[in-house]
Each structure stands twice: as structure tokens, then as C-alpha cells.
Regions:
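Catalytic cores of alpha/beta
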Residues: 82-96, 144-148, 158-170
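Generic structural signal for well-ordered alpha-helices
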Residues: 18-26, 50-61, 87, 91-92, ...
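Short beta-strand/loop segments at the ligand-binding rim of alpha/beta enzyme cores
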Residues: 7, 65-82, 144-154
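Glycine/Thr-rich beta-alpha phosphate-binding loop at enzyme active sites
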Residues: 39-52, 92-150
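Conserved, mostly hydrophobic/aromatic
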Residues: 34-35, 77, 102, 142, ...
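Active-site beta-loop-alpha junctions enriched in small/polar residues
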Residues: 7, 37-39, 77-81, 105-109, ...
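Active-site glycine- and acidic-residue-rich loops that bind
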Residues: 12-19, 45-52, 75-96
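Single conserved hydrophobic/aromatic residue that forms the stacking wall/gate
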Residues: 1-10
Length: 170
């Protein structure tokens, strides 16, 4: 079994769960996000692997397209804890499937050396200012990997107008 939205709830087929969610919610949504990046959900980040991601994206796009006249844009949200091969694989899957956009990034499992106090030893996703540099670098790498052909939304650690502008420039 794979675990889905919390460590207390497991599913034997995460892709089927996403498809059910898309089918039910698409007629009501302005846009939808396929989050494959929660560090707090065991096994979820495995859906970022190229083969699994392509399978998932094909399935949710088909579900969205079958949900009636309303076809909200579908975006996929990815983790910041990716190497260049993973970024390339995700970009390739996103472009090949025709997903509408990518959100970079969710929270990180990394703990920067500058982090102090209890947060330094906490498990789970780290957000806020410590995420800004990593998330912005990953956003820039996705822009290069997609040759600017895929709409990107940069999130993570934005605390000011200057931070927002840095994401735009990334």
C-alpha cells in the first residue's frame, strides 16, 4: 500500500485517488494542483519519478477532460529537494503530457546550517525564508529545463516585493 494524504490513511492506488479527486472537483474549480511533493506523506514524492509522474499526469488530464465542459488548468507542484536529473525528468514528463503548468516548490526536508533552535532538528517540511534560495534556484532550473515552454509559478520563502520580483526574474 502507498500512503496518501496523511500517515494514518493509506491507499493501494494513489493515482486512482487523484483521478477520483479530479473527477469530483474539476466541475467546481478555477484551477487544480496535483501535489506530488509533500514531505510529510510517506511515498508521495515517489510520484515525482519520471515514469510514475507521466502515468499520473496522463490519468489526471484524462479525468479532467472527461469531467464535463469545465476544464480547469492542471498544475503539478514539485519538491525543492531535486537533483538536475530529476528536474530534467519532471520537465520532460510535464511537457510530454501537456500539463498546464508547474509550481516550484513545496517545503524542503533540508535543514540549512544557518537554521537554529528547535527547527534545526524538526522532521517534515521547512518553509519560510530558509526555503527562498533553494526554491528560487529550482524554479530557475525548471525554466531552463522547459525552455520557457511551460508556465511556472514560483513559491517558497517570499516575504517581500523584492522576493516576489526575484522569483519573476528566476
Amino acid at each position: 500500500k502507498e500512503c496518501d494524504w496523511s500517515s494514518d490513511v493509506c491507499s493501494s492506488d494513489l493515482i486512482a485517488d487523484y483521478v477520483k479527486g479530479i473527477a469530483v472537483l474539476a466541475p467546481l474549480a478555477q484551477y487544480m494542483v496535483v501535489n506530488v511533493s509533500s514531505p510529510n506523506t510517506p511515498g508521495l514524492r515517489d510520484l515525482q519519478r519520471k515514469d510514475r509522474l507521466a502515468e499520473l499526469l496522463h490519468a489526471v488530464i484524462a479525468a479532467r477532460n472527461s469531467a464535463g465542459e469545465r476544464r480547469p488548468p492542471l498544475l503539478v507542484k514539485v519538491a525543492p529537494d531535486l537533483d538536475s536529473t530529476q528536474i530534467s525528468d519532471i520537465a520532460e514528463a510535464a511537457l510530454a503530457t501537456g500539463i498546464d503548468g508547474l509550481i516550484a516548490t513545496n517545503t524542503t526536508i533540508e535543514r540549512p546550517s544557518s537554521l537554529q533552535g528547535v527547527a534545526k532538528g524538526e522532521a517534515g517540511g521547512l518553509s519560510g525564508k530558509p526555503l527562498f534560495g533553494l526554491a528560487t534556484r529550482i524554479l530557475s532550473e525548471f525554466y531552463k529545463a522547459t525552455s520557457g515552454k511551460l508556465p511556472l509559478i514560483g513559491v517558497g520563502g517570499i516575504l517581500s516585493g523584492a522576493d516576489a520580483y526575484a522569483k519573476i526574474k528566476a
